């Protein structure tokens, strides 16, 4: 099941490039969280919010870090909101699948014991990528 895209007859069909873009966007979530932590550690940008940040080109490093943090948080929020919309109460499993690359077999065996069957899991994943691409 790994790497399968929905067929052209599916209501969640995306062309190959768009599907790959949505998959790679979702896989970047953990890296964006790590980058936010490093940006917060190296500057005082944690105290900035979107209303206080100036978008001038001559801003200092703290302002640039704050702008980057705000941008990354908005990307993470898009992914998280899409997961909560489509997951049907299985947020943790879908997050592991789309953000960490876990397969159906990995989620049904071992310590995770996901309660979804293969078809339902695939449909939720395809719906997630379809919805995420239209949010990006």
Residue ranges and their predicted role:
Residues 100-117:
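Helix-turn-helix DNA-binding module
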Residues 93-94:
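A short pre-motif secondary-structure segment
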Residues 1-85:
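N-terminal interaction/assembly modules
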Residues 84, 98-99, 133:
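Short, locally clustered residues in the helix-turn-helix/winged-helix DNA-binding domain
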Residues 121-135:
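DNA major-groove recognition helices of helix-turn-helix
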């Amino acid at each position: 099941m790994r790497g399968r895209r929905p067929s052209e007859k599916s209501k969640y069909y995306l062309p190959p490039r768009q599907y790959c873009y949505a998959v790679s966007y979702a896989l970047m979530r953990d890296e964006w969280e790590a980058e936010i932590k490093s940006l917060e550690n190296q500057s005082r940008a944690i105290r900035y919010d979107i209303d206080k940040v100036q978008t001038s080109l001559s801003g200092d490093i703290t302002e640039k870090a704050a702008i980057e943090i705000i941008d990354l948080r908005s990307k993470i929020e898009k992914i998280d909101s899409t997961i909560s919309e489509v997951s049907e109460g299985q947020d943790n499993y879908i997050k592991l699948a789309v953000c960490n690359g876990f397969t159906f077999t990995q989620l049904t065996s071992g310590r995770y014991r996901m309660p979804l069957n293969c078809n339902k899991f695939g449909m939720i994943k395809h719906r997630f990528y379809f919805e995420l691409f239209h949010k990006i």
